[in-house]
Each structure stands twice: as C-alpha cells, then as structure tokens.
C-alpha cells in the first residue's frame, strides 16, 4: 500500500510539472491550473457569464470551473458594470473616465434629486448617452465624485450658502467665482453640448434605455440581469421565524435534507435557510460569550472571604488562667545564655496535642505550653505541663495542681512518654532538668 500511494503521488506531481511546463504556473485549492499574473482565457470567462445567466451562484461557478471565488466575483462584477468580459490592460495607467463633462452631469443629477444613488446616476449616464460601456465610470468613482462635491460645498463657508440655496431652488448659474472640482469643469446649469435632453423624472427614469440598435438591447438585457441578481434583504414572516427557531433549537447544523424539508414547509429557498442558520449561529455565539462574561462576574462577586482565624468549634475550649503567667526560658532551662533569655508574658492558653490515638484529652487537665529545646540528636520538641512559680501559687485556681506536687505525663513524641515531676515549693530544678537533658 505505501508503494501504491507513493506511485500515485509521484504520478500527480509529474502531471502538475508537465502542466506547468505547458505555460501553467500553479494549481489553486480547487484543483484548477492558472498562469500567475496573467488573466483567465476568454473561453473560461464566457463560461462564467453563461453559468451566471443560467442562475448559478458564484460559489457554484467556482466549484464547477475550478476557478477561485474571488476571480469569479470580480469578473461578474465587472461584467455587470461594464458589460464586458475582457480583462483590463496590464500595466500603464487607466484612462480617466471622470471627465469634466461627466462630473457636471453627476452634479446636475444630484441637484435634481439629492437622494439619488450612484448606480442610478450610472444608469442615467448610459441611458442619456453621456457615456458608453467602455468609458462609463464605476459606482465607486461616482461616489468619489459625490464626496468631492460635498466637501467642496462644505468649504464654501458663508459665501457658499447662497449658492446652496440657488441649487436647491433649481436656478441656473455658475458655482460662484470658485473653480470647478476638476480643471475645466463645465457649468452644471448649462445644457449639454451633445444635445442630450435633461430628464425631469429624477431617479424614476433609471430604466429608460436609448435606442441605439444592438448595443441598446444588450445593455437592456444586462441591466435586467443585474437587477435580477442584486436581490434585496429577505423579509421573514412570523411563522417562518418560529419554524426556523424551532429547528435551531433542535440542531445548530441542519443537514441538506433537513434544510430542504424546512424549505418546502415554510416556502423559502434552501440557500436562504442556509444563510439564516449561519447568521443565527453567529448571533448565538455572541450571546453565549456575553452569558459567560456575566457568569464569571457573578461568581467572582459571590466568593466567600477567606478567614485567617481557625474555627473554635474544632478544638475543645481551654479555661484561661486568671493571672497572666510570666517566666523566662533561661530560668526554666537552667542556663544563663542571654540569647535564650526571652520573656513570655500573657501567653494565650494552648491545648496539648499528642500523637497517641487511644489517649483522649481530659478536660480537667491544665493547659500546657510548648517549649522548643535546643536542637540535639535525641531531643527535638517537647510539651510540658504548666510550670507555676512559687510566688504565683496563691493566685491560681483551685482546679490547678496542688502544692504538694502531682505527677503527670508529658508526651514527647509518638510512643514515648517521660514522667515529669512538677515541684511544689522548691524553686531548684537541678534534680528535674538534668534527667531530660
């Protein structure tokens, strides 16, 4: 199998190489060959126009002829505008189509009907014989001329206000002493030298075609095709919208059978239904993004603040001593090192925790404080019962240790216990601490 695939790939590459040698320089994504920098042949252009006349969409024409969609759209757009399928000249400058005469007619049409569209002006230029299919300006060129007219009127200032009123009243005359928009611009109010009569209907005479033989018939057919292919926005009824929304709730990506069934049900073309679902999915993605943003904002605002204090319900409360205990670690350890002399005053009560699982904490035991001894190979951290100095015994509670001295067990580590003798009246700890050290 790998050898067969390699053979097929080698055959395809050799075929492409042979095509490139025969004046072809590339293969597009659809599998069609083209010559880079050169226009399509006239036969392919004629097929594109014929398929468009038969009702095929540009995307279908692109797949049928294996020509890129942009190329098909560009050729059809130029054909609708000029009626020509010939490519434009390669290199050089284009001839100027916005001549002073054409600019004057455009200004005249704009004065007669301020709401006229650029494509209507273009049709009037063709119908009145001002331009031909070869030198007719495009819609973008007409819009550019209209923008220049508007900017020129804004720059007139106070002196131009009177001229604007004259234009609105339809009075003939010049545009004041200012020069035209282009050098040598003809006066808009003067009649055309070609003898073309001015139409009084404004934009209503856009479909009137001058009878010039075969060119007139061809132009009329082309304009009708252009009006047919340039559709308006589809208006959906409430029943159609409900059916589409119901299908969208079922699935966001209906197959061709579902679209055809829905098209027969609500009397809409399948292509319109496909476009509606594409737009509806885009709208749903925008709404979903907003919902996620709101959900994140609500979650961040409803977070519970973290408390730095421990819950008191976990540990058993320990009774606090009535008198603050004050002692020095140096006196307890029997050492005179100044670095270890730290005064503890008013220490909070801390429970004594053990690692023994079977030894519960007795509530009657007194609180203990954890003292960290110096690091040694055998001693790490130990917990001792509360040491009460002799001068503090009178202020202790009756539940504290008796003065005669009681024996308790101080747990050092898991499984190890050391008996601790708490002296009652002797301040000397020499008999006690050496045992631990």
From Swiss-Prot:
GO biological-process terms attached to the record: anterior/posterior pattern specification; brain development; epithalamus development; forebrain development; habenula development; hindbrain development; neural crest cell migration; positive regulation of cell population proliferation
Tissue spec: Spatially restricted regions of the neural tube.
Low complexity biased stretches: 295-313
Listed transmembrane segments: none
Record GO terms (molecular function): DNA-binding transcription factor activity, RNA polymerase II-specific; RNA polymerase II cis-regulatory region sequence-specific DNA binding; sequence-specific DNA binding
Any one cellular-component term (Gene Ontology): nucleus
Keywords, sorted A to Z: Developmental protein, DNA-binding, Homeobox, Nucleus, Paired box, Transcription, Transcription regulation
Subcellular location: Nucleus
Region (Disordered): 174-222, 286-317
Main location: nucleus
InterPro entries on file: HD, Homeobox_CS, Homeodomain-like_sf, PAIRED_DNA-bd_dom, Paired_dom, PAX_fam, WH-like_DNA-bd_sf
UniProt-annotated stretches for the region PAI subdomain: 26-82
DNA-binding interval(s): 23-149, 229-288
Annotated Polar residues bias: 187-213
Annotated region (RED subdomain), positions in chain: 101-149
SMART domains hit by this protein: HOX, PAX
Function: Transcription factor expressed in spatially restricted regions of the neural tube during embryonic development.
Similarity remark: Belongs to the paired homeobox family.
Record-given protein name: Paired box protein Pax-6
Protein's organism: Danio rerio (Zebrafish)
Lineage: Eukaryota, Metazoa, Chordata, Craniata, Vertebrata
């Amino acid at each position: 199998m790998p050898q067969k695939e390699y053979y097929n790939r080698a055959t395809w590459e050799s075929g492409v190489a042979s095509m490139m040698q025969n004046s072809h320089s590339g293969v597009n994504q659809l599998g069609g060959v083209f010559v880079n920098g050169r226009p399509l042949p006239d036969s392919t252009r004629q097929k594109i126009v014929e398929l468009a006349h038969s009702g095929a969409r540009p995307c279908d024409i692109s797949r049928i002829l294996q020509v890129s969609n942009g190329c098909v759209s560009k050729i059809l757009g130029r054909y609708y505008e000029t009626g020509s399928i010939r490519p434009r000249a390669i290199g050089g400058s284009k001839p100027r189509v916005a001549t002073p005469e054409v600019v004057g007619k455009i200004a005249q049409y704009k004065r007669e009907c301020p709401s006229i569209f650029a494509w209507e002006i273009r049709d009037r230029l063709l119908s009145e014989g001002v331009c031909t299919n070869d030198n007719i300006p495009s819609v973008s060129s007409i819009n550019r001329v209209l923008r220049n007219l508007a900017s020129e009127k804004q720059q007139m200032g106070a002196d131009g206000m009177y001229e604007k009123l004259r234009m609105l009243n339809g009075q003939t005359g010049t545009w004041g002493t200012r020069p035209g928009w282009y050098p040598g611009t003809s006066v808009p109010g003067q009649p055309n030298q070609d003898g073309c009569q001015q139409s009084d209907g404004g934009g209503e005479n856009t479909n009137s075609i001058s009878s010039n033989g075969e060119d007139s018939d061809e132009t009329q057919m082309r304009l009708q095709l252009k009006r047919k292919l340039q559709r308006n926005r589809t208006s959906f009824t409430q029943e159609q919208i409900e059916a589409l929304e119901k299908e969208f709730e079922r699935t966001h990506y209906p197959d061709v059978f579902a679209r055809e069934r829905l098209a027969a049900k609500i009397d809409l073309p399948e292509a319109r239904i496909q476009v509606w679902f594409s737009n509806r999915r885009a709208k749903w993605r925008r709404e979903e993004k907003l919902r996620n943003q709101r959900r994140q904002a609500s979650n961040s605002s409803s977070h519970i603040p973290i408390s730095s204090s421990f819950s008191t319900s976990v540990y058993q409360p320990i009774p606090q001593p009535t008198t603050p205990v004050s002692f020095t670690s140096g006196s307890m350890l029997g050492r005179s090192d100044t670095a270890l002399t730290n005064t503890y005053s008013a220490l909070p009560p801390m429970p004594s925790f053990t690692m023994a699982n079977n030894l519960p904490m007795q509530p009657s035991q007194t609180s203990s404080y954890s003292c960290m001894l110096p690091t040694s190979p055998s001693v790490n951290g130990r917990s001792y019962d509360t040491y009460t100095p002799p001068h503090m015994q009178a202020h202790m509670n009756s539940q504290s240790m008796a003065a005669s001295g009681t024996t308790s067990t101080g747990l050092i580590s898991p499984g190890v216990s050391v008996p601790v003798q708490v002296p009652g009246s002797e301040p000397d700890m020499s008999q006690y601490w050496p045992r631990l050290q």
